[in-house]
């Protein structure tokens, strides 16, 4: 197997409740900086970054989505065709962990087959106010075959590590050629008819 | 001896120079009156230049800059030696249990400083102060952080050269004491101002002779009233606020920085009135320790100073027994800190503290009277004679008022409002034009007379006559039509800056800004073992470092327990007065240059033919002065008179120019906000109930436009929360909160800070106009529709760019949602957003679509070279857009685009015949790159190339004049069409056909391509008479 100098491109999506630090994780990973007050994301934001493994280079096309439940209808547009997903929660909030579990289920049901899902417990720098125990999340991740890490976008703890682990786990088959990670821009149907919308509860 | 000095007896001034304006937006400030003498020209030899006389009645109006250093709450983390924002347990800061993230910057000297919350909080509080308005308060104009010293704030305020302190000196020199009725009027006006401040929950705390100013009409103007509030009751500054000489006993007991309530100002007033009448300060010393002891002695404490009523002077004495002990002081502290205890409990506790001994004070005042009497009897030259009128010269009632002010126990001391009700002040009230304010109170069209009208005296009713009439009197040329306005201090300051004024430069020029690194700025006096008394340590533990530089002429004693540090900067009570004659001159010139008629004509012209008579207004100060005058009239008319009359005029003028200083008011009037209704609606919403989005607000608000000082302040967070919550409670049923509404609300909050009702009403009106279809539970269809219109506009104006975006699959879905769902408020910083919104508010609600198109076209050259990934990344560069260009491009696109392109064509329940007005599935319409237009747009503009792609036979039977029949299947179609490229092309196609042909034109980069909605059928239906019909049938 000779993958030297080969670049593999993957589409990765971030999901999770509002204000758990999705944008902050991406910005820490891509630009290496952190803002105390990151503007909320509306719709979605796109960023790209590469990760060098031993023998290959993995390029992530990252879709950072809006966390507010209202923007849920848009989410399928971004996770459709994604080979990887990071589902983020705030270790200080049990609600956000519950929401993360829902996202994982949705991805398992509606996401690409073989999608690599990572569960990230963010805001590790505020561990003093922790509400979600590491063991609990760890156990859930193991049961569901997810990668799991607790991260801090603020201190950058485990941020690169998380992306590297995902990169390692992604299959480097010849079919994943650059560009295949492009978003499928088919608007989602469930919002269109306007009759019954399951997403707004 | 009792001769009344002309400059002092102010009563007679009231009616002449104090015209009360009832027809202008601004109430207090610099008054300008222009008299147009053309109409009744008695003097035929009048030179043209002198046709109108302009008087600027500034009454000695000045602007002062007052720099003060605020405390940099720098916390140094000693664990790792680095400087960090969060305070750890070992941090030097003794406060903040929950660490709050802070950002730092490093200054030239490599010292990390906090770009801290205190700056933002001070700035947000300053907006409250600048919203105040009272005839006896000098207007608080602005607080601006110094660019040079990052721990310095510059307060810009209305100010006057003359003060009570100077007045006393002048009178002393002239050997004519200030007469009793003038002292009474001073007391009345100071009390009015204090009672206004107190009603706004503000305490002056540093009332003193030098910040009670007098304007040229000898009316009281209080200054420096904002510092105590601004610094969070002294928390944000490292110097004590308040002049010790006028500091109340309870303030002293609470320590240098302890909070004062409004009663402290009443004490200060008492001291000041006594000072004016005696001509000297009652404490007769300037040593902080001695003064402190004397104040406390008169308040009933046993201290090292006592007043000997026989020798009539204070004496040093042995302290026999300390009454104030630690325990009592603690009680006092408890009283301050513990908010949970009941009012009665508080009262009980404060009674325990022995402040209720009034003997010493009474004794003191009585001996003052006796001493005076003895002096005048013996006629011996006492050291203090002839400076003041003396206590015996005052009326009995005024002495009584002073005595009430000086009641040691704040619980017994009356508040300012009660004092103002004292019958003594009735004679001043009766001739006070401002007492009659209720007549023209805002929000009332007619005179809102009080119930007690019968009780008014004839004299009072007569005096109203002076108020309504504007055109008589004044210092002008008399007669003719007058054109007048009042410019507020903020506006004068704005003009001054437009004329090149810069407060930092001004300070340097006047020698105020002495550069010294802030680390050297230690308090002048550092309390080592601060104690209240010199001889015992049983006193208070609070520092008493009172010393004021403006008393430098007197000898300063060195307190043994206070160490003087070198290189220090203590609170500087100096104010830098700014010369404004250039501003006043400019205003005069403007009024002469643009008389009402000249200005009207100018607007007509510039509105009619877009000529450039009024171009470059941003740099045209004269024009801005006049435009602001016009807006004053219109905005006043809008709020208090007939809004339907003034709103179109506001539109017209705002299209010309929106002065930044009036932007908030102009916006809200364009949005149709009425102050009174806004308040009613806002107050009717119960914000105490739990709202459905409260949690989300709490997540979103702390990250909304946080670079903005007001929005990142605590006050800003609180107010934004209330506005959003009010909106969501009001829209519980149909509307709902989408993230981004916080961004939309922000500009309104910034303009109406501390005025939540107006900010809320403006937001509501804005959302109703631009966002109501999006702020619903399911907005997908509406959002898709908007993005489709945007995409079609882009195709219409820049087909090449659109083609490229489609080639690289950069769909509007992926980048433009935040644009439309917030009308750009999410993606642009507020200063840029304001420029966009100025136009958006004045134009039809389709303008945002044009703005979006012109915005992306600005980046076309880069985007055309980009692939998907670079293209989508490029979208994060949108905030760097040139908004002025964006607006002018969007407007010219708007003018070149048929109106019907952006209008929805569906009408529900239409006839089967009118198939073109029936709803077409979105999926089908989405395939159309081009916009559809209605027949009106085809008929009204003859400059179009009309391509009819029906069969030649159909064309022969019936066609639109000058239309061209084209076979869409022609082999060399592109070459054939090339001749029409660049012209407006309208395609007429048979039902359900022509999409491919028209799309093809766009793919060939033909701009301005549209399709006639309904084709020939709609023409036959709507414009049959215009068609050319073959007679063969």
Swiss-Prot record, chain A:
Regulated by guanine nucleotide exchange factors (GEFs) which promote the exchange of bound GDP for free GTP. Keywords: Cell membrane, Endosome, GTP-binding, Lipoprotein, Membrane, Nucleotide-binding, Prenylation, Protein transport, Transport. A motif (Effector region) lies at residues 38-46. GO terms for molecular function: GTP binding; GTPase activity. InterPro entries: P-loop_NTPase, Small_GTP-bd, Small_GTPase. Belongs to the small GTPase superfamily. Rab family. Required for the fusion of plasma membranes and early endosomes. One of its GO terms (cellular component) is early endosome. GTP binds at residues 16-24, 35-41, 64-68, 122-125, 152-154. The gene is rab5A. The keyword Calcium does not apply. The keyword DNA damage does not apply. This is Ras-related protein Rab-5A. It comes from the Eukaryota. It is a lipid-anchor.
From Swiss-Prot, chain B:
SMART domains: S_TKc (SM00220), TBC (SM00164). GO terms for molecular function: ATP binding; GTPase activator activity; protein kinase activity. Residues 535-546 have a biased composition (Polar residues). Residues 1-21, 35-55, 81-101, 535-560 are annotated as: Disordered. Residues 36-52, 81-97 have a biased composition (Low complexity). Residues 72-425 form the Protein kinase domain. The keyword ATP-binding applies. ATP binds at residues 78-86, 113. It comes from the Eukaryota. Keywords: ATP-binding, Nucleotide-binding. Pfam families: Pkinase, RabGAP-TBC, Rhodanese. Residues 548-558 have a biased composition (Basic residues). Residues 657-844 form the Rab-GAP TBC domain. InterPro entries: Kinase-like_dom_sf, Prot_kinase_dom, Rab-GAP-TBC_dom, Rab-GAP_TBC_sf, Rab_GAP_TBC_domain, Rhodanese-like_dom, Rhodanese-like_dom_sf. Belongs to the protein kinase superfamily. Ser/Thr protein kinase family. The protein kinase domain is predicted to be catalytically inactive. This is TBC domain-containing protein kinase-like protein. It comes from Dictyostelium discoideum (Social amoeba). The lineage of its organism: Eukaryota, Amoebozoa, Evosea, Eumycetozoa, Dictyostelia. The gene is tbck.
């Amino acid at each position: 197997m000779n993958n030297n100098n080969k670049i593999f491109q993957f589409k990765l999506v971030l999901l999770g409740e509002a204000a758990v630090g999705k944008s902050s994780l991406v910005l820490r990973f891509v630009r290496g900086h952190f803002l105390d007050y990151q503007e909320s994301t509306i719709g979605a934001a796109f960023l790209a970054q590469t990760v060098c493994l031993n023998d290959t280079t993995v390029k992530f096309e990252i879709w950072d989505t809006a966390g507010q439940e209202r923007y849920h209808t848009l989410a399928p547009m971004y996770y459709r065709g994604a080979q990887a997903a990071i589902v983020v929660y705030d270790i200080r909030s049990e609600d956000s962990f519950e929401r993360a579990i829902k996202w994982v289920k949705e991805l398992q049901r509606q996401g690409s087959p073989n999608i690599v899902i990572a569960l990230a417990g963010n805001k590790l720098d505020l561990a003093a106010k922790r509400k979600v125990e590491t063991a609990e999340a760890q156990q859930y991740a193991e049961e569901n075959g997810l990668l799991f890490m607790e991260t801090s976008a603020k201190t950058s703890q485990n941020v690169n590590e998380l992306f590297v682990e995902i990169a390692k786990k992604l299959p480097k088959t010849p079919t994943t050629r650059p560009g295949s990670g492009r978003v499928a821009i088919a608007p989602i149907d469930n919002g269109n008819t306007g009759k019954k919308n399951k997403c707004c509860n | 001896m009792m001769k009344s000095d002309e400059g002092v007896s102010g009563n007679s001034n009231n009616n002449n120079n104090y015209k009360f304006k009832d027809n202008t937006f601004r109430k207090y400030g610099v008054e300008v009156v222009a008299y147009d003498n053309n109409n009744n020209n008695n003097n035929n030899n009048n030179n043209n230049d002198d046709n109108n006389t302009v008087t600027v009645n500034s009454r000695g109006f000045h602007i002062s800059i007052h720099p003060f250093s605020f405390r940099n709450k720098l916390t140094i983390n000693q664990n790792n030696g680095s400087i960090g924002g969060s305070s750890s347990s070992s941090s030097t800061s003794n406060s903040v249990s929950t660490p709050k993230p802070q950002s730092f910057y490093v200054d030239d000297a490599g010292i990390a400083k906090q770009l801290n919350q205190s700056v933002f909080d001070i700035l947000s509080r300053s907006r409250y102060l600048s919203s105040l308005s009272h005839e006896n308060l000098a207007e608080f104009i602005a607080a601006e952080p110094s660019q040079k010293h990052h721990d310095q704030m510059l307060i810009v305020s209305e100010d006057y050269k003359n003060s009570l302190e100077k007045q006393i000196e002048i009178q002393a020199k002239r050997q004519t004491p200030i007469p009793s009725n003038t002292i009474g009027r001073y007391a009345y006006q100071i009390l009015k101002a204090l009672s206004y401040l107190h009603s706004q929950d503000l305490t002056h705390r540093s009332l003193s002779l030098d910040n009670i100013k007098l304007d040229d009409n000898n009316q009281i103007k209080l200054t420096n009233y904002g510092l105590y509030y601004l610094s969070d009751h002294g928390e944000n500054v490292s110097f004590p606020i308040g002049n010790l000489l006028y500091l109340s006993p309870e303030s002293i007991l609470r320590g240098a920085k302890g909070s004062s309530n409004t009663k402290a100002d009443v004490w200060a007033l008492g001291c000041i009135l006594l000072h004016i009448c005696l001509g000297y300060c009652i404490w007769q010393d300037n040593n902080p320790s001695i003064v402190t002891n004397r104040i406390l002695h008169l308040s009933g404490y046993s201290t090292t100073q006592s007043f000997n009523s026989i020798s009539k002077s204070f004496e040093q004495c042995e302290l026999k027994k300390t009454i104030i002990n630690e325990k009592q002081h603690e009680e006092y502290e408890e009283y301050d800190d513990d908010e949970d205890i009941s009012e009665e409990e508080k009262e009980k506790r404060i009674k325990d503290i022995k402040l209720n001994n009034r003997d010493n004070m009474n004794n003191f005042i009585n001996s003052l009277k006796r001493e005076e009497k003895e002096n005048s009897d013996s006629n011996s030259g006492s050291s203090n004679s002839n400076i003041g009128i003396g206590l015996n010269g005052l009326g009995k009632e005024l002495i009584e008022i002073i005595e009430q002010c000086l009641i040691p126990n704040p619980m017994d001391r009356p508040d300012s409002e009660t004092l103002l009700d004292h019958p003594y002040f009735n004679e001043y009230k009766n001739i006070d034009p401002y007492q009659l304010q209720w007549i023209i109170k805002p929000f009332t069209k007619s005179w809102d007379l009080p119930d007690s009208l019968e009780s008014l005296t004839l004299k009072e009713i007569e005096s109203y006559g002076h108020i309504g009439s504007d055109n008589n009197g004044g210092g002008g040329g008399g007669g003719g039509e007058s054109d007048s306005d009042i410019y507020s201090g903020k506006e004068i300051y704005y003009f001054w800056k437009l004329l090149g004024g810069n407060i930092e430069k001004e300070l340097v020029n006047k020698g105020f800004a002495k550069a010294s690194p802030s680390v050297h700025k230690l308090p002048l006096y550092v309390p080592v073992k601060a104690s209240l008394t010199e001889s015992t340590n049983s006193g208070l533990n609070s520092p008493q470092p009172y010393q004021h530089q403006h008393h430098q002429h007197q000898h300063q004693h060195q307190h043994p327990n206070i160490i003087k540090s070198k290189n220090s900067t203590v609170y500087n009570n100096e104010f830098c007065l700014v010369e404004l004659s250039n501003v006043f001159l400019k205003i005069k010139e403007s009024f002469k240059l643009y008389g009402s008629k000249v200005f009207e004509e100018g607007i007509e012209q510039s509105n009619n033919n877009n000529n450039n008579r009024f171009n470059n207004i941003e740099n045209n100060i004269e024009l801005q002065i006049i435009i602001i005058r016009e807006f004053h009239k219109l905005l006043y008319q809008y709020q208090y008179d007939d809004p339907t009359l003034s709103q179109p005029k506001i539109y017209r003028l705002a299209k010309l120019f929106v002065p930044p200083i009036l932007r908030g008011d102009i916006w809200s009037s364009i949005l149709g906000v009425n102050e009174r209704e806004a308040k009613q609606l806002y107050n009717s919403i119960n914000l105490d109930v739990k709202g459905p989005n409260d949690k989300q607000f709490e997540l979103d608000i702390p990250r909304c436009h946080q670079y903005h000082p007001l929005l990142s302040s605590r006050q800003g967070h609180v107010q934004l929360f209330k506005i959003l919550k009010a909106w969501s409670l009001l829209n519980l049923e149909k509307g709902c909160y989408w993230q981004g509404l916080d961004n939309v609300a922000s500009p309104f909050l910034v303009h109406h800070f501390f005025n939540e009702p107006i900010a809320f009403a403006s937001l509501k009106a804005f959302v109703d106009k631009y966002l109501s279809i999006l702020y619903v539970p399911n907005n997908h269809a509406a959002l898709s529709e908007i993005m489709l219109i945007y995409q079609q506009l882009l195709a219409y104006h820049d087909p090449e760019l659109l083609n490229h975006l489609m080639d690289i699959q950069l769909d509007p879905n992926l980048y433009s949602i935040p644009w439309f769902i917030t009308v750009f408020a999410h993606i642009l910083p507020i200063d840029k957003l304001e420029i966009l919104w100025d136009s958006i508010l004045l134009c039809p609600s389709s303008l945002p679509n044009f703005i979006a198109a012109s915005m992306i076209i600005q980046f076309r050259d880069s985007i055309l070279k980009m692939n998907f990934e670079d293209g989508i990344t490029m979208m994060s560069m949108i905030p760097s857009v040139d908004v002025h260009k964006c607006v002018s491009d969007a407007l010219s696109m708007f003018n070149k685009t048929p109106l019907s392109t952006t209008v929805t064509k569906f009408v529900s329940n239409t006839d089967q015949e009118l198939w073109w007005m029936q709803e077409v599935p979105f999926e089908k319409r989405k395939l159309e790159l081009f916009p559809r237009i209605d027949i009106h747009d085809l008929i009204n503009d003859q400059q179009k190339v009309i391509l009819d792609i029906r069969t030649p036979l159909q064309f022969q039977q019936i066609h639109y004049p000058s239309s061209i029949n084209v076979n869409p299947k022609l082999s060399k179609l592109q070459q054939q069409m090339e001749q029409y490229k660049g012209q407006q092309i309208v395609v007429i196609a048979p039902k359900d056909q022509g999409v491919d042909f028209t799309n093809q034109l766009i793919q060939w980069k033909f701009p301005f391509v549209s399709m006639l909605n309904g084709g020939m059928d709609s023409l036959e239906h709507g414009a049959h008479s215009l068609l050319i019909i073959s007679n063969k049938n």
